[in-house]
Amino acid sequence: MSTQPAPPPEAPSNLLHVQFKNPEFLSYLSHLQSTGQVSLGRDSSCAKFDPAHPLTEHNVMAYFATSPFFDRRSNNEQIRMQNIANGIQNLSGGMGAKQEEQELKRFTGLEFVLVHSREPTCFVVQKRWRTSPTETTPLAAYYVINDSIYQAPDLYSILATRLQSTVYALRMSLSTQRRARPSFDPRRGHHGRFIVADAPTSIDADSNRTCTTQSTHTHHADDHTPQLEHQQDHIHPPPPAAFTQPQLKKARFD
């Protein structure tokens, strides 16, 4: 019986963003099945062979081995190399997924096993570490949907993403509610907050400088006014300014 060392310390690579499809290999499988060079591997009760979806339990693991999700250091690769050395073709007359799973029980280490099949559009492949013929530890899961292979997210990634989305939405809701809440305390009751004027900008400084220059020119022009106007002002003083209401600052209730 072949043995392997303990599982590697590194975590499995995250390929959740990868979608893999091999049209050339699928076309080759369709050609083999349409010409009768390989059995369909389906029960008599299953649907008729569909050239557009040639995957079956018999060839889906060979198709999965062409994807970046497959590990060449696995026991599946060792079995495939042994079959090639013995002249056994995996696609025509070779062992299927069930036979390969039974063969993998003789090894310990990394392996890929077909755990669910609904031909020809849905397959689930599990990556696991085998420590004995009866004990395995799941590491990752992959599913084949309509000839495309994906990596299934683990429970930790799903919960972390959902919790992060929930916390973000809750924080935004509380921030909006905080800005819209009324200002109230038992001692003062409802009260408003005065709006503080913004600091002067460079545009305001230029405007003030222009007004100062204009007032200076006006003052020089008034120096040439006849003294008669000043005497008339002393004789007939201007009427008192009309009473104006005090200006109130605008307030907003937060």
Swiss-Prot record:
Question: Gene3D superfamilies attached here?
Answer: Mediator complex, subunit Med6
Task: List the biased-composition ranges (Basic and acidic residues).
Answer: 219-236
* Domain of life where this protein originates: Eukaryota
Alphabetized, the UniProt keywords read: Activator, Nucleus, Transcription, Transcription regulation
Q: Where in the cell is it found?
A: Nucleus
Ranges where the record places region Disordered: 205-254
Q: Where is the composition biased (Polar residues)?
A: 205-216
GO function term, MF aspect, one: transcription coactivator activity
One biological process term from GO is:
regulation of transcription by RNA polymerase II
Main subcellular localization, coarse class? nucleus
| A Pfam family per the record | Med6
Q: Which GO terms describe its cellular component?
A: core mediator complex; mediator complex
Belongs to which family?
Answer: Belongs to the Mediator complex subunit 6 family.
Oligomeric and partner information: Component of the Mediator complex.
**Biological role stated in the UniProt entry:** Component of the Mediator complex, a coactivator involved in the regulated transcription of nearly all RNA polymerase II-dependent genes. Mediator functions as a bridge to convey information from gene-specific regulatory proteins to the basal RNA polymerase II transcription machinery. Mediator is recruited to promoters by direct interactions with regulatory proteins and serves as a scaffold for the assembly of a functional preinitiation complex with RNA polymerase II and the general transcription factors.
Q: What is this protein called?
A: Mediator of RNA polymerase II transcription subunit 6
The gene it comes from is MED6
